[in-house]
């Protein structure tokens, strides 16, 4: 895992919330002892500000460890409750950028599937709606740009913008693979990818209302990963 400075990750902070650009390769929360993650690093950051007090940090949503992008954390239980309400009521905007090597027939579209998580393998798959444990997953995608790259099986990389309607486990990775557009660098859902590129997925845009004053908060980041290099539209 890469080393990182949590101070460099913080995009915004006030008494209620903390917004970060999570680096790829860093877990939001880790079960491994001694492994740096966003939660422990941010708690250490907060503890330095209030010595002697146990800092509160509410995890509102997550990104897979190999995924980079914007995350919001709550600094009070009240802020956490309000942000969770916005997540549940689908008033939070989440946009992603992804990279694939497969160009779909439709340059834009809506994907709707049912996914089931397998806790034993930490993976999800597309199943029938009546499968026990199945959860509806939907997203919208649109092709942004295509560039040449001899490292991929098709000789190209394709940038895709994705707007999430739901937030299921590994949703984008699973739905895109099922559609025939597996993400580059995805070791779990793209078995045919022989490139050494890291996972091409970034949470690039997050918008919500401030839990205390209702002000619209909007954050955008540019992906830093190798898989995104060369695209002019970033």
Model-found features: residue ranges?
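RNA pseudouridine synthases
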Residues: 1-234
